[in-house]
Design a protein with these regions (language model features):
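Short, surface-exposed, charged amphipathic helix/loop patches that serve as local interaction elements
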Residues: 14-110
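Extended acidic low-complexity intrinsically disordered regions
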Residues: 1-15
Length: 110
């Protein structure tokens, strides 16, 4: 049985300030196998993870690609976000997927 994958919304303050309105990404956790597959493709892994986990905005939308002059969704991300923002959003997807946080507890002797 496939577990329901958690989602969360993250605002990018720099883009919100430029747009004069909140710019929010809705992200979804990825299953273990998908995260591992994307990490094996080490070149631009952060961008691949963000593309796979971003629910909204639709990074494949022609209007968004046109606005940021990106021919591909990956190019759109690079034009839209700073490198640190890409990394932070990618980390957020990993955290939603159970990575980069403590998901276990130490068993005390006794």
């Amino acid at each position: 049985m496939k577990a329901n994958l958690p989602t969360a919304r993250y605002e990018v303050p720099r883009l919100s300030e430029e747009a004069g309105a909140p710019v929010v990404f809705t992200l979804r956790a990825l299953p273990y196998g998908r995260v591992q597959e994307l990490k094996r493709l080490t070149e631009e892994a952060d961008i691949r993870i963000l593309l796979a986990g971003c629910v909204d905005p639709d990074l494949k939308a022609a209007a968004l690609q046109e606005k940021f002059q990106g021919v591909t969704p990956a190019e759109t991300i690079k034009a839209m976000l700073l490198p640190g923002e890409i990394a932070d959003l990618s980390i957020a997807v990993e955290k939603l997927s159970g990575y980069r946080r403590t998901t276990i507890e130490e068993v005390k002797n006794g």
